[in-house]
Amino acid sequence: LLLLGVPGTGKTWVSEHLAAAISGDSTLLVQSTAGTTEEVIRYGWNYASLIARGPTAEALVPSPIMTAMRDGKVARVEELTRIPSDVQDALITILSEKLLPVPELGEAVQAVKGFNVIATANDRDRGINDLSSALKRRFNTVVLPLPATAEEEVTIVSRRVADLSRALELPAELPAADEIRRVVTIFRELRAGLTEDGRAKVKSPSGTLSTGEAISVVNSGLALAAHFGDGRLAPSDLAAGLTGAIIKDPVQDA
């Protein structure tokens, strides 16, 4: 399964909860970066043991994906498109044949029933690599869009802000719906490049201004209100967070 969408649409949250619900374990994770190598996806070696005894089963260091194959669990690959394209293709045999060859030992790991992979990928971000057609065909792709309506987005932001405030034990009053609606409206207008009433065009910034960023802005404002204010969220508490979310590139977004 490939969860595709812009940053901040809840792909990681969905993948984590799906893995936990299906196999009772969401920790078999490959966190992708531009420096991710095939060893991270397939397997590596304990080099001290490898030098002393050569390639043995004891010297082999399984990747999270190999562990998931052996245990019949779900492996997660975060930010798949950040992995270089030639390394991504190491997944093709694993996904199509459910098989991971280990030629150094003259054997292969056959996936146990229950094994699967849930990957997430951004389709609008810097530093991403296109997926090959062969790899795309081996995934069932689900696109996670931004909320369709302002009301839906306000509801999502309100719920997540309340959850995070409880988790962080912030001694601040939860923001009124009007404050959250103001942040959501700003984000939606900038994403669309048009004011809510359709009368004026506005410049869209280079960032995605996702729902996740709206949650972060409101939560950051609550923390400022709790520790440096009177415990009530004020527009001034949101201002710094809004500036940081909107102006990602000082030149392009000026």
List each model region and its residues:
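AAA+ P-loop NTPase catalytic core and its hallmark functional loops
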Residues: L1-L168
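Short acidic/histidine-centered micro-motifs embedded in hydrophobic/aromatic stretches
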Residues: T9, I94, I186, L238-G241
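A diffuse structural propensity rather than consistent per-protein peaks
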Residues: T37, V61, S210, R232-A239
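Residues that form generic nucleotide/phosphate-binding pockets
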Residues: G44, R138, I156, R160, ...
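Conserved AAA+ ATPase small/helical "lid" subdomain
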Residues: V154, V161-R232
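C-terminal engagement/docking regions of AAA+ P-loop ATPases
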Residues: A226-A254
